[in-house]
Amino acid sequence: MNYLTNLVQFPGLGLSFHLNRVAFTIGGVSIYWYGVCIAVGLCLALVFAFRHSLEFGVDPDSMVDVILIGVVLGIISARAYYVAMAPFKYESIWEMIAIRDGGLAIYGGIIGGFLFGGLACKWRGVPVLPMFDLTAMGFLLGQGCGRWGNFFNQEAFGCNTTLPWGMYSEATRAYLMSSTVTVPKGVVIDPNLPVHPTFLYESIWCFVGFFLLFRYIKKRKFNGDITLRYLVWYGAGRFWIEGLRTDSLMLVPSIGLRASQLLAGIAVVAGIAAEVYFTRKFKGKPLLVPLALNAENKAAQKKLDGPIAFAGKDTQLLASSPRKLFLEKTEAYNAQVKAAIEQAGQKKA
């Protein structure tokens, strides 16, 4: 059952909130907090990506199409994954595609975002691994904000807890009384007791991960380093948090292993293995970031039937270089390339 309003209580803290799932109304159309939280997370991710793209050797104008494709198909993938986990609960195709009431699986969004975003990078000539690193940072911001949509919807919570921050509402009670609850064999659920606010756990986990990786950006050893560390960090947190939830697909009830935990475990193991391998491979080799060629110069080069011969020396910077230096050097580099293109065009004419 979906509640438009909820009295949400944290008995151990003496706190209670009257929540309305509707944030505001435009022309008779209700805009839900769930969508607002996702939109805020997306905006923060975009601000980060455009502000720091040059430090990864990515031209901000060139990545616009990549972002649009990655976001749209990522959301579609998130919904498709969610529906695939419980396809028989929907009575029509319209219910399957309706996301206003919630129902986006983060794993589907991550997989779709990276997959289709990577293909878009190839199409637009954007370096794939550096773009993945930017995307991983954006995911942490987006997920950290987006999880609060689950709070307003009163969904994606955990099993009973006696911890001070345990949460209770009519929505949690109604769900725990339903037949769709999934818990490990032998675990007893009491609908009248507080539950783990797992949305809060994951939100905090993502924001802490963003802070740690942000401090590591200048120390990264190879392209894709941030992405691998994201997989390990998020996978580890998701494995733990998923074990507390009551709404995920159970694979092995006897030990409480869920499908999402299996994916999280694979991400952690694969991420650690790849991180160790590439760290050893690039040991002692500082990461050099090519200066980003802007979209205007890329288009001009194509008209000249390929890249021009460029005699400039400052075409790369150490990844540890300050952001201000990346801005200055990239601007100067593109000015030199533009002048060289114009000169080459005059000779060709």
Where are the model-predicted features located?
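A feature for loop-to-transmembrane-helix boundaries and adjacent hydrophobic helices
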Residues: 1-349
